[in-house]
A protein has these predicted regions:
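Conserved ABC transporter NBD signature motif
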Residues: 81-92, 96-97
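Conserved ABC ATPase signature
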Residues: 113, 154-161
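Conserved ABC ATPase "signature" region
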Residues: 121, 125, 132-150
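Conserved catalytic motifs of ABC-family nucleotide-binding domains
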Residues: 175
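Catalytic Walker B motif of ABC-type/P-loop ATPase nucleotide-binding domains
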Residues: 179-182
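Helical segment within the ABC ATPase nucleotide-binding domain
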Residues: 194-206
Length: 206
């Protein structure tokens, strides 16, 4: 557990590193500033996350966690600083770079008119065109998230915990090198939360 304080701004992070050698930098942020009018959401943020790490941003609501994630994903324009993913500057048109990232947003983003399996196949298909390979990846994601018994169900019929697992399956099915999650366990029961956290640990070791 690391605690840091800079210019009156504090952050508490939960950090775990796998492997003994110095792994490659996945996310490198320098001097990142983001303002909303008179409100400074990110104040000269410095961050380096390396391959094999599980890294968590912890803080109260409004502390800038989601803003930081949106800036990393190039969903939000920032005022100053630089963000590099795998050593390359992240830009809105960095499509090849974005293919290596799995995104699990705070709000469940799936299609109500598609079944569990169809949703996973759709999101996987955004990155993987080969049907045979995509079928294998979808099956892997379903098995990994424990959704085998719910493949033909529609999202509206799922519990909160199952929806979260579906959200994760959609984000990781294409086997990305980097997975970014925004509060993946929010509003789920303790049992589902533990399963999700165990799954994240398993992903890190694969």
């Amino acid at each position: 557990m690391n605690f840091c304080s800079k210019k009156g701004k504090t952050c508490l992070t939960d950090r775990k590193r796998g492997g003994k050698h110095m792994p490659q930098s996945m996310v490198h942020i320098e001097n990142l500033v983001k303002r909303y009018g008179d409100l400074t959401a990110l104040n000269h943020l410095e961050l380096d996350i390396r391959e094999g790490e599980i890294f968590g941003l912890l803080g109260p609501n409004g502390s800038g966690k989601t803003t930081a994630i949106n800036c990393i994903l190039s969903l939000l324009k920032y005022d100053r600083g630089q963000i590099k993913i795998f050593g390359e500057e992240m830009k809105p048109d960095s499509y090849k770079l974005k293919e290596q990232i799995g995104i699990v947003l705070q709000n469940v983003a799936v299609f109500d008119e598609l079944t569990v399996q169809e949703n996973i196949d759709y999101f996987c298909g955004l990155y993987i065109r080969d049907r045979k390979r995509r079928k294998e990846l979808v099956e892997d994601a379903i098995e990994f998230t424990g959704l085998e018994d719910f493949c033909k169900m529609y999202p509206k019929k799922l519990s909160g915990g199952l929806l979260r697992r579906l959200n994760i399956a959609c984000g990781i099915a294409h086997k990305p090198r980097l997975i970014i999650m925004d509060e993946p366990t929010v509003a789920v029961d303790p049992q589902s939360r533990n399963k999700i956290l165990e799954g994240i640990q398993t992903l890190n070791h694969q």
